[in-house]
Every structure is written in structure tokens, then in C-alpha cells.
Amino acid sequence: KSIYDNLMGYLNYIEDYYFQILKESEYVEYPSPHESLFQNNYTKLREDIIFCKKECDNWYKMVQDKTKERVCLNHGNVSLKHIIRNSKSYLISWDKNHFDTPIADLIDFYHNEWNNLEFSGILETYFSKCSLSDEEKKLFFINISIPLKVEFGENEYINTIRVTDLFDYIHKTELLIGPYYSIKNKEQ
């Protein structure tokens, strides 16, 4: 219940946050490039938030009667910088390790490296080697689908890059999880 409440609370917060940005930019007579880009793509952001809320409700229906939750030791800050490759690969820098759901590190890794790696093969390999329940997969997909929070500053160039990254993140995540929601995949 607390995971559901936290997710829904954050989704409501991020929805209000971006709605306020949209409202403020609508009053500008000549919108800047980042404001114009944001206005033109706001419906995509809104659709993503609606999808996340719907999936949160579906996930909660799946787990509301469960009394046990699976936990494991998580690294806490997985990124490419913390992987040493040799004949075997090693994960270093365990300073932030903690016990959490098995998907916590996968979520962090996606948030840290979404723009640097093609994750479809990584997920396929991960799901084949590590057994995740349907509930855990759904929770993972919800968490990575939540839009990133963009902070704006004084530099228009950087603001435009941040808005572009926001919508690139949404698009790339949509392409990544889409096959797992296809009719063919649901039948298997």
C-alpha cells in the first residue's frame, strides 16, 4: 500500500508540476524554444502520466492481497562507471547498498544510463536469467515510465536540451516497454 501511495503521490506531484509550467508558458507572448517545445509535446507527457496512473491501479489490484514482499541486497547506485570488465564483470562501489525489491537496481541503472545504452537486449537477458514475477515487472515498467523532473535555469540552450531529453526519455521508454504490453506477449 505504501509503494502505491508513494507512486500515486509522486505522479500527482509531477502532473501538477508540469501543468504549472504549461500554464506559465501559455501566458508568454513569444515563447522561448524550450517553452514552445514543451507546449507542443505536453500531450505526450500527459498521456505518459495517465498510463502510469492506470498501470499503478492495475499493479495494486495484483498485489493488494499479498502479505509477503521479496527483497534482496541492492547496489544502490548502478551505472557503467561502477562496472569493471575483465574475464568476468565486477560491480564495484557498494557504499550505498541496501535491501529493497529486486527491481530497485534495475530502475536506478535505467535512470542513470537510459541515454547511453540500448536496453531491450539488457532487459531480455535480465528477465531470462533473473526470475521476476509479473507484479515486479509491472512495477519496474511503471517506475521507468514516470517522466523525469526537469529543473529550468537561466540558460535557454540548456533548458531546451533538458526538455528534449525529457521527451526523448519518454519516447525511448515507450519503445522499450511496448513489446511487453503487446497482445502476442500477453498471450505467452
Task: Describe the role of every protein-language-model region.
Residues 1-26:
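Conserved ATP-binding subdomain of kinase catalytic cores across diverse folds
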Residues 7-10, 41, 45, 143:
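Amphipathic alpha-helix face/heptad-repeat signature
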Residues 18-75, 186:
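An alpha-helical support segment within catalytic cores of ATP-dependent transferases
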Residues 19-22, 151-188:
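ATP/Mg2+ or Mg2+-diphosphate-binding catalytic cores
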Residues 54-104:
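Active-site acidic catalytic loop and adjacent metal/ATP-binding pocket
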Residues 62, 142-143:
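Short acidic/histidine-centered micro-motifs embedded in hydrophobic/aromatic stretches
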Residues 99-133, 144-169:
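Active-site activation/catalytic loop segments of kinase-like enzymes and analogous catalytic loops
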